[in-house]
Amino acid sequence: MNTIKTSIIALMSVALLGTITFGLIYFDRFDKGKSTMERTFAMIKPDAVAAHNSGKIIDIIEQHNFNIVGMEKTKLSKNQAQTFYAVHKDRPFYNELVDFVTSGPVIIMCLEKDNAVKAWRDLMGATNPANAEQGTMRKLFATDVCHNAVHGSDAQETAHQELTLFFPDLA
């Protein structure tokens, strides 16, 4: 039996100067049977934004058939970053991570695809770019473990939490 779901898709255009504009469009999607479609949270970190790699990263995301359901260019507050990285609060790198992610603009996204969490993690590559496979985001755009270009949820539950924090209507 088919069900109709109302979904939101963010239409965007990336100008040569890196400006991102948005419009929202609603559409009906017919789901047939059991679906593996899921959503995940993605972030282009300040190092990749500052290096003008955002457009390249977004192009690769689209080439791998992700639907960009929501996107925003923003600068995270210290409070947002602390909440986002709360799981690492007791780790020695926590303060450096918070300082880094608040050091400049980021691009946050809600991505949708079959098995989106795993697909995005595979496309990102290993946290340490030295260990990342050729063709992955981190092999292409990261410089070290901290400045590793992109973030992605590590599980469906984490994706839901991260999407709720930044895109509550899309979680």
Residue ranges: model-predicted function:
Residues 2-171:
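Non-catalytic terminal and connector segments of soluble metabolic enzymes
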